[in-house]
Regions:
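A ubiquitous short alpha-helical element
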Residues: 68-74
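Charge-rich, solvent-exposed alpha-helical interaction surfaces
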Residues: 31, 83-87, 103, 138-141
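N-terminal accessory interaction module
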Residues: 1-67
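Short, surface-exposed acidic
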Residues: 90-105
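Alpha-helical oligomerization segments
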Residues: 101-152
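Short acidic alpha-helix initiation/capping motifs at coil-to-helix transition points
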Residues: 76-84
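Amphipathic alpha-helical interaction segments
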Residues: 58, 62, 91, 95, ...
């Protein structure tokens, strides 16, 4: 199974996402569609949460611009779900554990399904746009950069 991991090339995510915080390099990410602001009625300048162009870290819930598609084992995948369940319960006020688990499983499954459409070890970015009463997601794909044995 494939999933997303954060790629930090420099300190720009820390600066861009200073309000929400940046995900850590190598942290598991989810698509983060559940955390998209309502862009209707808000000017682009006022929409400073950057939710339309970022993924969300599973551990620290910081944002990330570039994600790498990588393999994830079943144990790590289950840990992703458990962290999301705790986040939905503790931070977002899910009404029940069952509701939190259902949404966490849905978010993890969506991210895994998304990753299956890409080759392993590519980098992707997201751009979300409102339309037809929903948020549409468009992904750009980039080959992972390497210098010697070092990933860039």
């Amino acid at each position: 199974m494939k999933f997303l991991k954060a790629v930090l090339l420099d300190a720009s995510d820390s600066q861009v996402y200073s309000r929400e915080g940046a995900a850590r390099d190598g942290e598991w990410l989810v698509s983060g569609g559940y955390a998209v602001c309502d862009p209707t009625g808000v000017t682009h300048r006022a929409l400073n949460c950057h939710c339309l162009t970022s993924f969300i870290g599973v551990v620290g819930r910081g944002r990330c611009t570039i994600a790498e598609v990588v393999e994830i084992d079943k144990s790590e995948y289950q840990q992703v779900i458990e962290r999301l369940v705790r986040h939905f319960m503790d931070d977002l006020g899910a009404p029940t554990l069952e509701a939190a688990r259902s949404v966490a499983e849905e978010e993890a499954a969506y991210t895994a399904e998304l990753c299956e459409s890409f080759s392993s070890e590519v980098w992707i970015t997201v751009k979300r746009t409102p339309g037809d009463g929903r948020i549409k997601e468009h992904y750009s794909v980039f080959k992972r950069l390497m210098i010697g044995s070092h990933k860039l």
